[in-house]
Amino acid sequence: EIEFTRTMHGIMRNISHFCSRTKSRTWGKDGWQKIVVCVIADGRQKVHPRTLNALAALGVYQDGIAKNIVNQKEVTAHVYEYTTQVSLDEGMKFKGAEKGIVPCQMIFCLKEQNKKKLNSHRWFFNAFGRALTPNVCILLDVGTKPDSKALYHLWKAFDQDSNVAGAAGEIKADKGKGWMCLLNPLVS
């Protein structure tokens, strides 16, 4: 759940940045209404229960209502949606409007089977992409902590040039406070 909350809180901070752009023709205080965060979990048995607890704390997941079979047919996935008003930081502390967090529209897709990453991408583009018809899609792996303005800069690349079909951001290792993580050979 720490990796999930790290990523999700980073996304929430980015949405707050979009909403802080009061002089923008596109964004502004209600900019959060133009953004939908889709979280796709690859297999009900594979997702960590504490990650589900974090999603429940955000209001987007309800434990105990998902069924394997409905009307004698196997269920492929469970879809939950909610507009959350709070975020959970890496320390599992709630952050809300008092810390600059704005509402966030969320869709949580809990796949029954673990069918790997490409199948999750297929779900995102074929199911949610077709329904939402977004102008820009940004894919993040769990554990990635986007800088507070990173998603805005990715969006801006598409907005400024209609010929841009893809963009990538820079990934930097988290060095930790006082660069303590550099003592870990996997980070350094």
UniProtKB/Swiss-Prot annotation:
Its main location: membrane. Its EC number is 2.4.1.16. This is Chitin synthase 2. Transmembrane segments: none annotated. Pfam families: Chitin_synth_1. One of its GO terms (molecular function) is chitin synthase activity. Belongs to the chitin synthase family.
